[in-house]
Amino acid sequence: MIHGRLTRTNADCVIQNVSKTSNFLERMRGLLISSPLTENEGLLIAPCSSVHTIGMRYAIDLVFLDRQLTIVKTVRSLKPWRIAASNASSMVLELAADSLDKLQLTTGQQLEWHDDP
């Protein structure tokens, strides 16, 4: 995993602790067999255009992003045993349920990735 943070293009920090998948196994595992994310955590899965919560015990919020990190779709509180997808996305940010409203993330917003030093 690669660790970093996501900001809006105006430098407003969105998520301080983001893990980005770096290989196939990390993408396949996702959040399976893990504790729920906290408000300030996220998992960025790339490349990815669909997500499932099969086998998970908790709901998550999803942010589908294109290659330029523009939000193309959001999904609120995807419950366990469900699937969500977006043909326009190349990566997905998984967040704790109810994070979208707190972070004020909406379609069309531009994000930026920053590696941890």
Feature map (PLM): residue ranges:
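Compact, glycine-rich, soluble single-domain proteins
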Residues: 1-117
